Amino acid sequence: MPQFLDSRQPDFETAFTALLGAKREDSPDVDAVVAGIIADVRARGDAAVIELTERFDRVALTPQSLRFSTEEIAQAVDEVPAPERAALELAAARIRAYHERQMPQDADWTDDTGARLGWRWSAVSAAGLYVPGGLASYPSSVLMNAIPAKVAGVGRLAIAVPTPDGQVNPLVLLAAQISGVDEVYRIGGAQAIAALAYGTDTIAPVDKITGPGNAFVAAAKRRVFGKVGIDMIAGPSEILVIADRDNDPDWIALDLLSQAEHDESAQSILITDDAAFGRAVAEAVDKRLETLERRAIAGVSWRDFGAVITVSDLDEAAALSNRIAPEHLELCVSDPEALAARTIHAGAIFLGQYTPEAIGDYVGGPNHVLPTARSARFSSGLSVMDFLKRTTMSRMTPEALRAIGPAAAQLARSESLEAHGLSVQARLDRLNG
């Protein structure tokens, strides 16, 4: 049974604080193992990757077979039924159109001293995407990671997808093809992250690594950060639904279960201003759990981390939402835009009764790679910006240097950086001499 909280009860603040602080992820301490794997890949390259892949995925590879060939991808893609292909192509088109609008503009201007200033944006040269493997892997994650990279202008995009016992989801390869992925490698785990970061004879290194993974992948991403950029270290999925009584309890129950079925550590929370409606939703969840295919997972998540919170009004709901800073926030209320204006911390907001979070997972257009564990307080979901870097530009004319150079020389002397100051002063002396 989930927790039932009421903001009007005297112990509410204590209970709510405990809900916020609940540890939902039992991460094993794998750092030492991961450090060893990374060191091995750095030292032995392909040989280490091949050996580790055979040990963990039970697949015997050679340097030549690490990468899927064009023919292998084409053969797998041909197996995808037309309806699934059409759905992927629709999703890809919408994701691409949305992310194209995110592209920032370069800037270039001349200020009142005559100095020319500005910035330009450029993509990283190469990016690597990790895709959890097997037949249960998620092609939508390929689209959500790969398309922004390609829209940003990344020249080379490589994917690492483990193939346990030689199994791969053809939809993953189709998603890679649709997204414009350049290379697909049949490797996984910390060894894949190490290979992407440091390179081997077969796998050229990348500049940025994105994509979800298990504890070993997360630990590897932490360790290679600095050598390469990473997107984020994502935790278990979460959803917060703010709903009034003018909703179908079954719809809201399904929205809550849409995240609960991801992981036993996922969290689904309902905030409502109607206690009876909250109870009706909880009953609808229980009813759906009787038949849901992933009821074993969803049931544990709902029991251990689910919550129904009753508040006095929607202003209070917005305030609590900002404290939760959820990954996904659904606003199933009569005026969702007004409520959205008061909710400033959320990975993604879904407005109105006809915008279930699952639309955002697949075909809405915005990215589904989102900050978890309250990190929406300070971070954003994946976008083209994750694959871009801004370079500042400046050009001084003689007049501009005369105008601002003396201040630079003075500040350099104040910081006891003699050569800094002299590099400016030497030019000023010639201009003024």
Curated annotation (Swiss-Prot):
<keyword id="KW-0862">Zinc</keyword>
<feature type="binding site">
    <location>
        <position position="259"/>
    </location>
    <ligand>
        <name>substrate</name>
    </ligand>
</feature>
<keyword id="KW-0560">Oxidoreductase</keyword>
<feature type="binding site">
    <location>
        <position position="130"/>
    </location>
    <ligand>
        <name>NAD(+)</name>
    </ligand>
</feature>
<comment type="pathway">
    <text>Amino-acid biosynthesis; L-histidine biosynthesis; L-histidine from 5-phospho-alpha-D-ribose 1-diphosphate: step 9/9.</text>
</comment>
<feature type="binding site">
    <location>
        <position position="328"/>
    </location>
    <ligand>
        <name>substrate</name>
    </ligand>
</feature>
<comment type="function">
    <text>Catalyzes the sequential NAD-dependent oxidations of L-histidinol to L-histidinaldehyde and then to L-histidine.</text>
</comment>
<keyword id="KW-0479">Metal-binding</keyword>
<dbReference type="Pfam" id="PF00815">
    <property type="entry name" value="Histidinol_dh"/>
</dbReference>
<feature type="binding site">
    <location>
        <position position="262"/>
    </location>
    <ligand>
        <name>substrate</name>
    </ligand>
</feature>
<dbReference type="GO" id="GO:0008270">
    <property type="term" value="F:zinc ion binding"/>
</dbReference>
<feature type="binding site">
    <location>
        <position position="237"/>
    </location>
    <ligand>
        <name>substrate</name>
    </ligand>
</feature>
<feature type="binding site">
    <location>
        <position position="262"/>
    </location>
    <ligand>
        <name>Zn(2+)</name>
    </ligand>
</feature>
<comment type="similarity">
    <text>Belongs to the histidinol dehydrogenase family.</text>
</comment>
<keyword id="KW-0520">NAD</keyword>
<feature type="binding site">
    <location>
        <position position="259"/>
    </location>
    <ligand>
        <name>Zn(2+)</name>
    </ligand>
</feature>
<feature type="binding site">
    <location>
        <position position="361"/>
    </location>
    <ligand>
        <name>Zn(2+)</name>
    </ligand>
</feature>
<feature type="active site" description="Proton acceptor">
    <location>
        <position position="328"/>
    </location>
</feature>
<dbReference type="GO" id="GO:0005829">
    <property type="term" value="C:cytosol"/>
</dbReference>
<keyword id="KW-0614">Plasmid</keyword>
<feature type="binding site">
    <location>
        <position position="214"/>
    </location>
    <ligand>
        <name>NAD(+)</name>
    </ligand>
</feature>
<feature type="binding site">
    <location>
        <position position="420"/>
    </location>
    <ligand>
        <name>Zn(2+)</name>
    </ligand>
</feature>
<dbReference type="InterPro" id="IPR016161">
    <property type="entry name" value="Ald_DH/histidinol_DH"/>
</dbReference>
<dbReference type="GO" id="GO:0000105">
    <property type="term" value="P:L-histidine biosynthetic process"/>
</dbReference>
<feature type="active site" description="Proton acceptor">
    <location>
        <position position="327"/>
    </location>
</feature>
<dbReference type="InterPro" id="IPR022695">
    <property type="entry name" value="Histidinol_DH_monofunct"/>
</dbReference>
<protein>
    <recommendedName>
        <fullName>Histidinol dehydrogenase</fullName>
        <ecNumber>1.1.1.23</ecNumber>
    </recommendedName>
</protein>
<dbReference type="GO" id="GO:0004399">
    <property type="term" value="F:histidinol dehydrogenase activity"/>
</dbReference>
<dbReference type="GO" id="GO:0051287">
    <property type="term" value="F:NAD binding"/>
</dbReference>
<feature type="binding site">
    <location>
        <position position="361"/>
    </location>
    <ligand>
        <name>substrate</name>
    </ligand>
</feature>
<feature type="binding site">
    <location>
        <position position="415"/>
    </location>
    <ligand>
        <name>substrate</name>
    </ligand>
</feature>
<dbReference type="InterPro" id="IPR001692">
    <property type="entry name" value="Histidinol_DH_CS"/>
</dbReference>
<dbReference type="InterPro" id="IPR012131">
    <property type="entry name" value="Hstdl_DH"/>
</dbReference>
<keyword id="KW-0028">Amino-acid biosynthesis</keyword>
<feature type="binding site">
    <location>
        <position position="420"/>
    </location>
    <ligand>
        <name>substrate</name>
    </ligand>
</feature>
<keyword id="KW-0368">Histidine biosynthesis</keyword>
<feature type="binding site">
    <location>
        <position position="191"/>
    </location>
    <ligand>
        <name>NAD(+)</name>
    </ligand>
</feature>
